[in-house]
């Protein structure tokens, strides 16, 4: 199999990644020390931009310390979990680092989640408090109703006029000139600082635990991956309840002493306007977002922007062509990572790039520090030769600490010290890795991991449904769309629209299927599991399905 390969020379004056991070004093892999060393070295440098607000590194340090003081006043201490429910906002940055300084743990959730989804995460994490955006407060409060002990609530910013907030107030509101006294730092590099819930084959999200050193090292790895420069302006449009925005964009900017441009959400119609106005130079994206931008009216494009590089999942040749030739963005870097193993592989910025490849094992700016090791194995755990498809196994110091309160699932994720990704891949003779398919029952839609088991369970609860099976089908935006195969109860009736309406009532909008097909039977294993691997090969399912996206 042949693949397009090319190399782009580094721009004159490019600073080597190790030199970029060596400009600052040691941080000891502590999140707060990472911020503090940058703020002490370059206090007036612009660190964070959010719409019409600009924060210097000194500003971010002060806001973080003030947030830490407010958290201390609420009794937040080592090991406590605090939920954060908001679209992207500067307060999430301050809260994340402040919680880490307290030795506490941020539990971010999607601001679009419904009550049931939020309830599961916050109850499983046993959060002691919730910092919510004003528009998310009601859902957060309903989700936490009945929790013992009852968590406290705080707004991440003052509520707009007319939006009810009851007795809940903003977490912190220290006027200028007030002395900040947040207490002695309690958290260190080995302490868990973030709990990210990711969909799993069980149908219930698993809480992925990461320590501070993981987050900092992932940021250092991102500086190497994208050759982030001191004057970089990193545009963050991906949500801060996922790995990419926190571990790559935010921490990568901090590591390099660069500038993070934070947008509330990805907006395709405003993307080029924002990129042009902010003079952003780098952006991370997902395949669906790139596909949407390619299909937008060209009058939205703003020539003269400063964006030069984009990191994301494997891009096809048309994406490369459009972004390089029409959008004037020469560097598209592909890579692979998971919530459990952030930034595991990538196409080399400073070497040969092979289109649609996952790339090679990631490197650290310091060549003496080894990051990723990778191997491909068969079902028995034996390594296979180059060109042979098997399961992708990864070893890396940037590895989850485990699944929260789930020793069984944690143990099942490893074999002989190697993390089992559940993804099928193969390696070529030159050490580049190529994704084939997912072994797990996970659907990848617009950057979200969606549990097929969760969809099966929720749709199976419809009074007319005997059984349901969710399957991934190719999306014209890249990644997957959702197809639901439905077996109705005898004598019951339901339409495709009925199934979609049920999903809209019980699930987040992104989990609503595009396709619904009614079947006479579902294939099963001897242990009564639906044989989805057989169904994925049945092209007639999609051909017969009702397309609700039309």
Where are these regions (language model features)?
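Conserved AMP-binding A3 loop
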Residues: 56-58, 193-217
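Conserved pre-ATP/AMP-binding loop-to-beta segment of ANL
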Residues: 43, 154, 176-197, 204, ...
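Structural core segment of the AMP-binding/adenylate-forming
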Residues: 3, 73-74, 101-172, 298, ...
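AMP-binding/adenylate-forming catalytic core of the ANL superfamily
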Residues: 113-114, 130-132, 337, 391-396, ...
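Conserved ATP/PPi-binding loop(s) of AMP-dependent carboxylate-activating enzymes
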Residues: 349, 353, 365-371, 380-412, ...
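Conserved AMP-binding/adenylate-forming core of the ANL superfamily
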Residues: 23-28, 32, 36, 44-89, ...
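Conserved AMP-binding/adenylation subdomain of ANL enzymes
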Residues: 216-233, 241-281, 296
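Gly/Ser/Thr-rich phosphate-binding loop
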Residues: 277-285, 294-355, 373
